[in-house]
């Protein structure tokens, strides 16, 4: 299992030791990272579903690709109320028009406000369809464990999601000391998935806006629990 952080989880100046990648955000660039990622959304993107939104997203992907980002995650709080079918239609449109790349690029669709299996199956179908486009881009699925817990996902639900490329684990109570017990429900879902599927093919990203000590303690915890 590869372990990563969002750039909001640490000072953002250099790649912390003990992690494999950083998920960058447009407002906070991280240096010295081997695997850089960007979130496909922005304050100037305009209303979701419009041609302006589509064009802004496509230009952002092209720009980040030129800067050396290998992967991109789609998932924005500003679009959570948009029906998943509309989101995926836009994603397909954007990905189909992306230019051919000389190196493999990866686009990840994050499940937000997920309705358990129904959203997963739809997103998986779109990801697989887009991955068939011969332009050296592949598409995968991200499950936000914090959102999964909030929406009532069960361990029975998650074992019916066999192909997930990345999980997001939410930090809890940024002002308090790091406490794995507060994330127990998220960890339980991930452990259940790992009972059935190969940990070698999945990434785990820690999301937190807390002090540096949180990500350091998370790295130690993740290594002991999943990479021992």
Locate the predicted segments by residue:
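Histidine-acidic metal/acid-base catalytic patches
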Residues: 1-18, 23, 30, 51-70, ...
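Short active-site-proximal "capping" loops at secondary-structure junctions
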Residues: 26-31, 41-46, 211
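N-terminal small/glycine-rich loop or linker at the start of catalytic domains
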Residues: 1-4, 34-46
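Basic- and aromatic-lined ligand-binding clefts that recognize polyanionic substrates
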Residues: 104-134
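Short loop/turn segments at strand-loop or loop-helix junctions that form parts
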Residues: 38-45, 74-79, 109-112, 169-171
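Active-site groove signature of glycoside hydrolases
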Residues: 66-83, 103-114
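Short acidic, glycine/proline-enriched helix-loop-strand junctions
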Residues: 31-37, 103-105
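Catalytic cores of phosphodiester-bond-cleaving enzymes
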Residues: 91-116, 219-220
